[in-house]
């Protein structure tokens, strides 16, 4: 949360519009409370140095899916879109998701297209990998 806030409010994303960032653990606190950052942008002069509201920058950041609660991932998808969520496992740490595909199955309202994006389509697109190439090996 703190690192992402520094990247946003420090103008890094304005200076480097093509920068690709992936935030662990769903970006922590920030996506759930980006309204607070947007409010700060509107009322604090030192925060108004960036070009857009913080919520607009969130849509340029990728987030892993490891948020531990299906409802939390549903909310993250609403905030940033499924196209910016990558499968997260936290491997090799013991707090990780051993069967992340089962976690995705528990997310309310997740469509098959969104599930496929999160399971690997988004990572392939982000990394410039032909997702169909592995099926031809």
Give each language-model segment a name:
Residues 1-84, 137:
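Catalytic pocket-lining loop regions of alpha/beta-barrel enzymes
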Residues 19, 29, 63, 67-86, ...:
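Mid-to-C-terminal alpha-helical segments outside catalytic/metal-binding sites
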